[in-house]
């Protein structure tokens, strides 16, 4: 049974999704528990729920994920927090599950969350989650995408819904400091109680596999388009064809010199003539050589440990790659892999 009786008031939806011929239909459903979380303009709340998703579902041994896997609810369990919209929502999903176990799915989630509220969150997991997202925010590594472009996109997370708050999501550093203090005062447990347990703006959605559904949908679309075409006059059809050709020609044509000149470009005068100074301050710590590079890192400390491997036999060298891959993901003498993961991030 679902605790607190709230399971009866959730919106319930069952839908089908397409699978290929030969794909299993049994134990191949998706079960999801979804809750709307406050307002997208509440930056602290949104950052806090990103941390909660990490602590409850993403980190190795995360309690909600582990409880569902231990109960064999689905072959994979994951969470999502959809922000950047006015009504963000938090989802817990079991993949490759039995569609008839949705009540058990819900009961395990709620029971686990109630235990967490009663006994408290794992403080190391919270600390690790907060530090993880603070690190990502400070580093702002957008790979090959220009940082200015990505910041420009980020401002829309708040600006779309309040013209007076374009920079709300660019000013997060103080929030991480605040969350570190609030984590010790029951803040995250209160969020779980309010938004994940007592929240009635929620749904239980089940996706059931169906063979041939893609072909059915294609046939329905073709029929709909055919009916629409038959409703058009000859002139209307010719106009659609002409508009399509015009659009294709516009997309393929070369840009004019005038248009190209509107693209801002760097000038030689924009590039500094002075080279970037490299700092390689060498000193020793406990007999180990340390090279220190004093450069701006936005408050992030980077540490690289380099080991001399010349004494590793040639036949064992391939296993060094395996060792690198499992470090941090297996139990050690003093920590389980879940504890170790949080210790590293904390």
Residue ranges of model-derived segments:
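M16 family metallopeptidases and their MPP-like homologs
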Residues: 28-38, 65-181, 202-210, 216, ...
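Extended catalytic-interface subdomain
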Residues: 27-35, 39-43, 47-53
């Amino acid at each position: 049974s679902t605790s607190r009786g709230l399971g009866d008031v959730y919106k319930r939806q069952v839908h089908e999704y397409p699978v290929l011929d030969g794909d299993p239909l049994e134990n191949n459903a998706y079960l999801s528990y979804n809750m709307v979380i406050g307002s997208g303009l509440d930056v602290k709340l949104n950052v806090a729920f990103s941390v909660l998703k990490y602590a409850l579902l993403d980190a190795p041994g995360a309690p909600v994920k582990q409880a569902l896997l231990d109960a064999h609810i689905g072959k994979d369990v994951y969470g999502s927090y959809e922000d950047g919209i006015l009504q963000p929502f938090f989802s817990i999903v079991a993949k490759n599950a039995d569609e008839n176990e949705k009540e058990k799915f819900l009961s395990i989630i709620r029971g686990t969350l109630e235990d967490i509220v009663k006994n408290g969150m794992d403080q190391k997991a919270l600390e690790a989650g907060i530090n993880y997202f603070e690190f990502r925010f400070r580093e702002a590594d957008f790979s090959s995408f220009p940082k200015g472009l990505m910041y420009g996109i980020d401002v829309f997370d708040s600006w779309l819904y309040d013209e007076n708050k374009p920079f709300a999501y660019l000013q997060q550093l103080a929030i991480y400091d605040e969350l570190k203090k609030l984590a010790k005062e029951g803040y995250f447990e209160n969020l779980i109680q309010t938004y994940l347990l007592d929240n009635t703006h929620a749904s239980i959605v089940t996706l059931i596999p169906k063979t041939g559904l893609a072909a059915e949908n294609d046939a329905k679309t073709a029929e709909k388009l055919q009916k629409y075409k038959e409703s058009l006059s000859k002139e209307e059809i010719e106009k659609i064809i002409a508009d399509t050709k015009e659009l294709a020609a516009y997309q393929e044509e070369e840009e004019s010199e005038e248009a190209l000149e509107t693209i801002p470009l760097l000038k030689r005068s924009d590039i500094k003539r002075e080279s970037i100074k490299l700092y390689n301050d060498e000193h020793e710590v406990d007999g180990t050589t340390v090279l220190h590079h004093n450069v701006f890192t936005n408050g992030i400390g980077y540490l690289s440990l380099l080991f001399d491997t010349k004494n590793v036999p040639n036949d064992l060298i391939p296993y060094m790659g395996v060792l690198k891959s499992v470090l941090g993901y297996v139990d050690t003498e003093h920590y389980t892999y879940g504890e170790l993961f949080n210790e590293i991030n904390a």
